[in-house]
Amino acid sequence: MNRPESIYDLLLAPLTLSLIFGGIGVVLLTNIIYSALSLGLVLICISFFYIILNADFVAVAQILIYIGAVNILILFAVMLMNNPKYPNYAPPWTVGDSISSIVCTSLFCSLITIILNISWFGISLTQKSDQMLERDLTNNIQRIGAHLSTDFFLPFELISIILLVALIGAITIARREETV
């Protein structure tokens, strides 16, 4: 998607000023919430720079990953840690902790066993037929989608499992009631 040069000139100055003021806000604001919101402004400005450079997928990934995940995670962590109802001491080891440890260890061992027993040679043979399919794809987003569903399927699924575990952990922490 090509844009006329005059659009670049109109967008460059306000984006640059927003980026500079947002960066100054990240460093100089004393309230951590305002600082995190200022970081969100900086990341949005960077994604607009990617759009100007015709890197649409990178811009969307910037918004989803850095603003939608990392910045929100920072805000949640700050809000949870500033809550006075959660004490700073660690609770003793409980039965639920040992059950969770056993389940996590068994899942880890089964994943390692599956990874070691997969025939990786057969997967590399399917990549040659995928290269023929890749020539028919027209834009970068379609090519990245094809790579995520073929070449990088295992890391993509592992990341989704890690995000699911992080989400469950955040919900558990948020729902925990004071037991003192």
From Swiss-Prot:
It is an enzyme of class 7 (translocase). GO terms for cellular component: chloroplast thylakoid membrane. Its main location: plastid. It comes from the Eukaryota. It is found in: Plastid, Chloroplast thylakoid membrane. The chain crosses the membrane at residues 10-30, 32-52, 57-77, 102-122, 153-173. Its EC number is 7.1.1.-. GO terms for molecular function: NADH dehydrogenase (ubiquinone) activity; quinone binding. Keywords: Chloroplast, Membrane, NAD, NADP, Plastid, Plastoquinone, Quinone, Thylakoid, Translocase, Transmembrane, Transmembrane helix, Transport. It is a multi-pass membrane protein. Pfam families: Oxidored_q3. NDH shuttles electrons from NAD(P)H:plastoquinone, via FMN and iron-sulfur (Fe-S) centers, to quinones in the photosynthetic chain and possibly in a chloroplast respiratory chain. The immediate electron acceptor for the enzyme in this species is believed to be plastoquinone. Couples the redox reaction to proton translocation, and thus conserves the redox energy in a proton gradient. NDH is composed of at least 16 different subunits, 5 of which are encoded in the nucleus. This is NAD(P)H-quinone oxidoreductase subunit 6, chloroplastic. It comes from Cryptomeria japonica (Japanese cedar). The gene is ndhG.
